[in-house]
Swiss-Prot record:
This is Patatin-17. It comes from Solanum cardiophyllum. Glycans are attached at residue 202. Its EC number is 3.1.1.-. GO terms for molecular function: monoacylglycerol lipase activity; nutrient reservoir activity; phospholipase activity. The active site is at residues 77, 215. A motif (DGA/G) lies at residues 215-217. A motif (GXGXXG) lies at residues 36-41. Residues 321-384 form a coiled coil. It holds the Pfam family Patatin. Keywords: Coiled coil, Glycoprotein, Hydrolase, Lipid degradation, Lipid metabolism, Plant defense, Signal, Storage protein, Vacuole. Gene3D superfamilies: Cytosolic phospholipase A2 catalytic domain (3.40.1090.10). A motif (GXSXG) lies at residues 75-79.
Amino acid sequence: MATTKSFLILIFMILATTSSTFAQLGEMVTVLSIDGGGIRGIIPATILEFLEGQLQEMDNNADARLADYFDVIGGTSTGGLLTAMISTPNENNRPFAAAKEIVPFYFEHGPQIFNPSGQILGPKYDGKYLMQVLQEKLGETRVHQALTEVVISSFDIKTNKPVIFTKSNLANSPELDAKMYDISYSTAAAPTYFPPHYFVTNTSNGDEYEFNLVDGAVATVADPALLSISVATRLAQKDPAFASIRSLNYKKMLLLSLGTGTTSEFDKTYTAKEAATWTAVHWMLVIQKMTDAASSYMTDYYLSTAFQALDSKNNYLRVQENALTGTTTEMDDASEANMELLVQVGENLLKKPVSEDNPETYEEALKRFAKLLSDRKKLRANKASY
């Protein structure tokens, strides 16, 4: 927790010293962050489909894509996979996947991705089908070709350091210009679920640079929103097009953070008396879910507090279902029945109020966000025409 607090303070310091030559135009830095959660990625995918549909309707453009509206798109684990899908270009230099195609992707490939390998030793899944699909979909595309700034995290188990793949880092670290399928597999390679991923790129001197990577959640927790904001602020220092963040002016930043759902069952199921007798194996079965839920909650707490304190609470929206039950809590239940339930979770979430204190539904809030995104895109287009 202390590390996250220090990180947030650092972000504030960066924001406070960021110069702006573009803010007078009413620009906004727009950030989309997508959590990890395995097959539960169906939940944010359902939300993204709704948002992209709203943007298409508002702008009367059936070809409108999320990458056209967000300056930064960040994701961890399955969120990193979604990030790649909506930002990697196809042969026409447009995102290879529309938001409405993501849920069908899970239905088509999820059962084979999460098909147990049958091995007694090693991870639960061999990852071969996941890699095959990623190679087919993403091709030879590399980070520098992404249609907007991306933030995809992983963790190198050889160096014991997080690895953050972004376009803005490539000038100083060209070895990070990896293939998108390598990055997408790496950020999803959750320990015990999939094997770690080894691959090699080249440094500026042409030397080989090796990566030994696992799931990005190991490095940045399951909610990458803070990480995505830090990249956005660094961009603001370097590029006038992103320079509208100034002096803690969160009114110039729009952050949409999408969760993959958490469960409220922990406090109903476990007591201190019961857990006192647990072995290491018992803890291993539940600690990851507990950690993910707690870290996601705290990230949301820090961000919502910051935006509210800086009179910009309407510029941050966290879309999260906090009461998953039964099979929907699992990261790897890719049965058709469970995936249908996850779609229902996403659709029902749109009708729920944002919070107890805010009767606005997520659907209404997303429509409001879509209007801001649309207006901001038109503003930039008008400026470019002069």
